[in-house]
Amino acid sequence: MELRHLQYFIAVAEELHFGKAARRLNMTQPPLSQQIKQLEEEVGVTLLKRTKRFVELTAAGEIFLNHCRMALMQIGQGIELAQRTARGEQGLLVIGFVGSATYEFLPPIVREYRKKFPSVKIELREISSSRQQEELLKGNIDIGILHPPLQHTALHIETAQSSPCVLALPKQHPLTSKESITIEDLRDEPIITVAKEAWPTLYMDFIQFCEQAGFRPNIVQEATEYQMVIGLVSAGIGMTFVPSSAKKLFNLDVTYRKMDQIQLNAEWVIAYRKDNHNPLIKHFIHISNCQQTRTKESDAGT
């Protein structure tokens, strides 16, 4: 049984006239009559009662007609959904992200994505950078938003965002009287950092700046995410360097200052498997690139 057999039957059942149905289908009557006869033989029951004067549906034919209509409707819906999925307008996109990506980078992209593709379900999972790479390779997430470096050649990487770092220090700290902080100011200060495994490049860059200045930083505490780091600064435990976007984490007990002689940049990248051809990824990358362009234009304007 082919799809056209159902279409032929529906036409005859609705017209109750083989001649009219044939014209509707742009075919001649004899082959149409033959196709309906073959359909009845395959189904194993009489679907249409024929006389010289009229055609009418049998009880079995009425039941079969209803199911034929539903079948064609479902097939049509299936075709539409398949096409929408292939175009990246339907489906599931699983995104892994580090917490710092939520300060200003990720939320507007998700908002724009949902606006353009409302039928796509987005699943967001907060995962560390190292584990994101594992989840990408296993196929458990489609996209990772994480910190460099990445070691796996199976992953495609695109720059997502770069943000200069500022110094976060307790509001009552004596250094808050200065507009900017030098590397020498940090020599004897207690330092809080994001753990090396959470953000290896930024961690090592800071260590290197201090060693070039002739001292090893006094790191008193490490944490895996900047929300906790800011909380520790607020408690007066020490000071830390954070992406300028982290200033959005409003805290009355923390003050931010520019850093002189220390050019630390926080970087995020977007990663996905090279063999992952999910069309939803392409749309995400495009929206991300547009967002970066708008951000750069806005920064240039200010």
Swiss-Prot record:
Alphabetically sorted, this entry's keywords are:
Acetoin biosynthesis, DNA-binding, Transcription, Transcription regulation
Q: Which InterPro entries match?
A: AlsR, AlsR_PBP2, LysR_subst-bd, Tscrpt_reg_HTH_LysR, WH-like_DNA-bd_sf, WH_DNA-bd_sf
MF terms in GO: DNA binding; DNA-binding transcription factor activity
Any idea which residues the entry calls the DNA-binding region? 18-37
Q: Which CDD domains match?
A: PBP2_AlsR
Pfam families linked: HTH_1, LysR_substrate
Q: Which NCBIfam families match?
A: acetoin_reg_AlsR
Known PANTHER family for this protein? HCA OPERON TRANSCRIPTIONAL ACTIVATOR HCAR, TRANSCRIPTIONAL DUAL REGULATOR HCAR-RELATED
Protein name, entry field: HTH-type transcriptional regulator AlsR
